[in-house]
């Protein structure tokens, strides 16, 4: 007698896996839209972004800085959480899990942990050393089926303690790095992380156009997407940007919504102190921000 275990079908079901960002970004570049990278900081952030991507049928990249990775206990914890959510939320859109502004050592840790994409930020190295380290990572990522982002020209502002002045990249250096076989290239074009100051001069489209001419079909990446005017975003996409990073804007929206909940005294009403209730307005604020960005970037219904 063969026992028919009703759980067998569930156990055998295929689980949607993390994907490299390569295919989604090549499609975006060809289709003149951009895929958003939204950085995650905890369970609520991750759930909000994944659910919004699924609702809008949009590909998405979950970014994890080295600082956020440490905050969430480590890269293996992050991979487990994201894979579990993709499965149990029934996420079917393409999802890449990407190390943001990774050190050389950080890239290897994420490769080992199961990320599907990494960024090696070698912009602070001399170009020869940047080339050598990037060349090595290109080979490793290709063997693992992962995507690799490289950077030329330091992005301004501060990213987990890494400070950049907002340089404009040298198009010739961009070509040198692109020719190594990276998946995508972040070129500094006057953009910065965090809030843009009142005296910000704007994006250098002259630099972006020159980089595009030098790198051809290479998907370009725009860091510091928070606060850049919509017309600049659209022009950047028209000049080859296929990936746009958003972090600060989600943080500001989450903080404002959470502050509003507490200041209204809702945490003192009934069981309003329950963290699931206290954090809910912030989660909805993240969803609204991600939706707005996906619509602006043109990635809706592009999964």
Residue ranges and their predicted role:
Residues 40, 97-103, 219-230:
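Glycine-rich beta-to-alpha transition loops that act as phosphate-gripper elements at the mouths
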Residues 1-16:
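Short, Lys/Arg-enriched N-terminal segments with co-localized hydrophobic residues
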Residues 14-36, 83:
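N-terminal amphipathic alpha-helix/helix-capping segment at the start of soluble metabolic enzymes
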Residues 23-25, 43-67, 77-92, 104-214, ...:
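Alpha/beta enzyme core
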Residues 189, 224-226, 248:
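Active-site proximal loops enriched in glycine and acidic residues that flank catalytic Cys/His/Asp
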């Amino acid at each position: 007698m063969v026992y028919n275990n009703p759980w067998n079908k569930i156990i055998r079901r295929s689980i949607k896996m993390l994907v490299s960002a390569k295919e989604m970004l090549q499609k975006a570049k060809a289709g003149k839209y951009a895929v958003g990278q939204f950085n995650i900081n905890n369970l609520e952030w991750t759930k909000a972004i994944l659910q919004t991507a699924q609702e809008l049928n949009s590909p998405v990249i979950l970014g994890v800085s080295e600082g956020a990775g440490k905050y969430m206990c480590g890269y293996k914890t992050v991979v487990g959480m994201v894979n579990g959510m993709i499965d149990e939320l029934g996420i079917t859109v393409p999802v890449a899990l990407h190390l943001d502004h990774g050190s050389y050592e950080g890239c290897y840790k994420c490769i080992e942990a199961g990320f599907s994409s990494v960024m090696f930020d070698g912009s602070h190295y001399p170009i020869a050393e940047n080339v050598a380290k990037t060349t090595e990572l290109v080979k490793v990522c290709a063997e693992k089926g992962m995507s690799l982002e490289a950077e030329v020209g330091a992005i301004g502002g501060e990213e987990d303690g890494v400070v950049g002045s907002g340089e404009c990249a040298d198009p010739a250096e961009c070509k040198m790095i692109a020719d190594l076989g990276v998946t995508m290239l972040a070129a500094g074009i006057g953009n910065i992380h965090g809030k843009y100051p009142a005296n910000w001069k704007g994006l250098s489209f002259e630099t972006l156009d020159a980089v595009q001419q030098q790198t051809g079909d290479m998907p370009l990446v725009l860091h510091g997407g928070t606060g850049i005017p919509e017309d600049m975003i659209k022009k950047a996409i028209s000049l080859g940007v296929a990936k746009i990073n958003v972090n600060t804007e989600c943080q500001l929206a989450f903080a404002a919504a959470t502050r509003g909940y507490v200041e209204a005294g809702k945490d003192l009403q009934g069981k309003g102190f329950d963290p699931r209730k206290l954090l809910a307005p912030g989660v909805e604020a993240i969803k609204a921000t991600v939706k707005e960005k996906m619509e602006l970037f043109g990635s809706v219904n592009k999964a």
